Swiss-Prot record:
Cellular-component GO terms for this entry: chloroplast; small ribosomal subunit
Matching InterPro entries: Ribosomal_uS19, Ribosomal_uS19_bac-type, Ribosomal_uS19_CS, Ribosomal_uS19_SF
PROSITE patterns in the cross-refs: RIBOSOMAL_S19
Pfam family, one: Ribosomal_S19
Protein name: Small ribosomal subunit protein uS19c
Amino acid sequence: MTRSIKKGPFVADHLLKKIENLNLKKEKKIIITWSRASTIVPTMIGHTIAVHNGQEHLPIYITDRMVGHKLGEFAPTRTFRGHAKNDKKSRR
């Protein structure tokens, strides 16, 4: 079930304040955040946000096509190492 429209998108307060301050100063700095659940809103376009993936912060440049998605969608938490090349036991 999707979020109710009357509630509006969730954006962490500290993240929104940082972005609004940078917009007023017209600065472009990397913003570090752990808030993967925050929704990308139009005021974030053009900023670089470093999202935590469990080990490190991955810098993500926000574009207009990302609006409405969550920050966590662009910072994968698991690394896929690939399938085993010569595993003959599993073929039986």
